Design a protein with these regions (language model features):
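Structural/interface elements that position substrates and couple domains in central-metabolism enzymes
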Residues: 1-278
Length: 278
């Protein structure tokens, strides 16, 4: 989305060090001003801080919701209902309130770390962001912990299908991807891993080699699998043929890391189903 984001930005933040620089940059960004896009001028340190703080705020919302989701499971609440309830508050809004298995990519992890490091270098502690980072790292293992619980800790020889490798849909980017943490833990526990991703297979091979089986499609991934883990919410995973999958799997267990399936429907189809936060 780089081109569309550039041509239709939510806002443009420009750091300048003088009135002359602001005048020159205003001329450069004149097409954006004519289209009524927000162009905000400020001093350079504030512009730099704005960029890091914006991504860190979004990362904070994600980790907060993941923490709430984990508590919902403990006390018997439904995180989807909680999300709807708090998202309807106009002071909060609905964006970035979806629980899952942690954020990844090149922006959120990097910018959170950058603010924490900048604070340390200046004798200050970013306690909230340190907690955000800690929660996110723990959340990347939540599906593995559910798997251990399902099999009472004995995972040796289990075949696990992964749907999704990239950190988000519509990309092959695996930087800081939860799938990498999950694969490491599964292999260490003695599991066989069968993975499919519409775009990130080659990138995964580049990173970890042939340690796992790379399926040609989502149905190949679940062949003789004991468990299916939904890792990345690609559109093609939303409406699979569950009848085919049920016949193909060795055991009918689904761990949904993105909450894209309906628990009641999955159980009526005969699957053992676990998701995040309910």
């Amino acid at each position: 989305n780089a081109i569309s984001d550039f041509m239709s930005p939510d806002r443009v933040v420009v750091g300048v060090e003088s009135a002359r620089a602001e005048k020159l940059m205003s001329k450069l960004y004149k097409p954006f001003l004519l289209n009524n896009f927000r162009v905000i001028f400020m001093d350079i340190p504030s512009a730099e801080m704005t960029k890091y703080a914006a991504n860190s705020m979004l990362a904070t919302r994600i980790s907060f919701m993941n923490d709430i989701a984990n508590l919902c499971e403990i006390v018997g609440a439904d995180v989807n209902m909680v999300r709807s309830g708090i998202g309807s508050d106009t002071r909060i809004g609905r964006k970035f309130l979806y629980p899952g298995i942690g954020y990844g990519g090149s922006c959120f992890p990097k910018d959170v770390k950058a603010l924490i490091k900048t604070a340390e270098q200046n004798g200050y502690s970013m306690r909230v962001l340190s907690a955000v980072e800690e929660v996110n790292e723990q959340q990347k293992s939540v599906l593995f912990e559910k798997l251990k619980k399902q099999f009472n800790g004995d995972l040796q020889g289990k075949t696990v299908a992964l749907w999704g490798l990239a950190f988000k849909p519509e990309t092959d980017d695996m930087r800081e991807a939860p799938a990498l943490v999950l694969i490491d833990k599964l292999l260490e526990a003695g599991c066989r891993v069968r993975a499919y991703d519409p775009a990130a297979v080659q990138e995964c091979k580049r990173r970890i080699g042939e340690k796992i089986y790379y399926a040609c499609d989502m149905y190949d991934a679940v062949l003789d699998a004991d468990v299916l883990m939904l890792v990345t919410e690609w559109k093609e995973f939303r409406l699979p043929s569950w009848a085919v999958i049920k016949k193909t799997m060795a055991q009918q267990i689904v761990l949904d890391g993105r909450n894209i399936y309906d628990k009641k429907e999955m159980e009526e189809l005969g699957f053992v189903y676990h998701c995040i936060g309910k």
